[in-house]
Amino acid sequence: MNIRTISILVILAIALAVVSLWMGQQAYTWLPVQASAESQLIDDLFSFLVTLGTFIFFGVVGTLTYSVLFQRAGKYDNSDGPPIEGNVKLEIIWTTIPILLVIWIAGYSYQVYDRMSILGPMEHVHRGMAMAVESESNKNTTPSIEVHSRQWVWEFRYPEQNVTSTELHLPKDRRVKLALTSDDVIHGFYIPAFRVKQDIIPGQKIDFEFTPIREGTYRLRDSQYSGTYFSAMQTNVIVESPESYENWLTNATKQPSKPGDSPAFSEYSQLVKSGRVGWKTIVPAPPPIINGY
């Protein structure tokens, strides 16, 4: 291989690296806003994987394209190819590189996993990312919020204040502790803007922690196919300042109790009234009685 060929390959590799790094930065814009401390780590990991994947993809496709266009046999060339039986050095290289890449990806992924301090499925506890927000405010934690899931409605209870709501209110920059339970089937607690997801198993209480860092209204979805109206099992997650959060709790304790919102139950009730029940399905759980609204 002469100097000219080596120079061209180096230039192409540098250009490919630049494009890959650019794609990795663009990957941040493909995701929702970063509304939790955990989202920063997850987005960095996603950007890393996009960068690496772009380099490999265009490197392989570029090599194949060059081979097809410039290394193919002539139109009327019917001669046999060179009798190459193998190349031990090349085979070692293309085996070693993927192994090292997989180890690199696994190591980085484990570092993210470890920094989030996730204990794993045996304990059914996600302790969240203890080091994600290096501030004194992050040391403060809220009392545990009970999250009850049933077909197809979310119910949130703040036991210390005796407040119940169908919307999840959270304070900004404070550790949030949730106690997740399911009354019927497996549900998925998933907030895309927070990059957190936890399956909720019937008959088990699962402790889950994270840190909201951005005020706003986000969507909580059931990420598991839990039945007919699972797509309607959505609600708002409202992140507000600690002062606004405390005011909301205080005002909620003074509100009279009333049935909360349940899109699944409302839709089913309308179908029953109109006589268009359709296929047989489980009757949605009635709206919970709430005072936080």
Q: What residue ranges belong to the model's regions?
A:
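Alpha-helical transmembrane segments of integral membrane proteins, especially early/N-terminal helices
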Residues: 6-27, 55-62
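Alpha-helical transmembrane segments
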Residues: 42-59
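Hydrophobic alpha-helical transmembrane segments that serve as membrane anchors
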Residues: 55-67, 102-105
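Alpha-helical transmembrane segments and their helix-start/interface "positive-inside/aromatic belt" motifs
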Residues: 1-14, 46-50, 88-99
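Non-transmembrane, membrane-proximal soluble domains of secreted or membrane proteins
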Residues: 21-46, 68-293
